[in-house]
Regions:
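Short, Lys/Arg-enriched N-terminal segment that forms or immediately precedes the first helix
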Residues: 2-17
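Short amphipathic alpha helix immediately N-terminal
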Residues: 23-35
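Hydrophobic positions on the alpha-helical face of helix-turn-helix-like DNA-binding modules
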Residues: 28, 42-43, 53
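Helix-turn-helix DNA-binding elements, focusing on the entry/boundary residues of the two helices
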Residues: 38-40
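Helix-turn-helix DNA-binding motif, specifically the short coil turn and the N-cap/start of the second
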Residues: 49-50
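Residues within the DNA-recognition helix of helix-turn-helix
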Residues: 56-59
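C-terminal flanking helix
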Residues: 61-68
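Helix-turn-helix/homeodomain-like alpha-helical modules used for DNA recognition
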Residues: 82-116
């Protein structure tokens, strides 16, 4: 995974699961991924060592990955987004219905709650 895709992924995971992290981990990850601050800048602004920043980033990323592995919200959102993009270009009604059924499957297999 290249750097840009990694940043995009962790920005998304942070927006989904950020509240489940410790305040310190969340703050450091936001500074690193959202504001593109260097490890040195983060260390200086938080009065901690570079090693502490690197450790917080590493542990925070691991936690975000664990949350995603367990809950799959990012994956499901990505699948739904791809299906919706596909649906926008469909001209055939039966193909559109098929895509809508795929979206329903993703929603029903996940933790999404749908009020009917």
């Amino acid at each position: 995974m290249d750097d840009l895709n990694r940043i995009i992924k962790y920005n998304s995971l942070l927006s989904i699961y950020g509240e489940l992290l410790s305040t310190r981990q969340k703050d450091i990850l936001e500074q690193y991924f959202n504001f593109n601050l260097s490890i040195s800048e983060i260390a200086e602004s938080n009065n901690i060592s570079r090693a502490a920043v690197e450790d917080a980033i590493k542990k925070g990323q691991k936690k975000l990955d664990e949350f995603e592995l367990e809950l799959n919200i990012y994956k499901e959102k990505s699948e739904i987004r791809a299906l919706l993009d596909k649906a926008q270009n469909v001209k055939d009604e039966s193909e559109l219905k098929s895509i809508l059924e795929e979206i329903k499957k993703v929603i029903n297999n996940g933790i999404w709650i749908v009020n009917a």
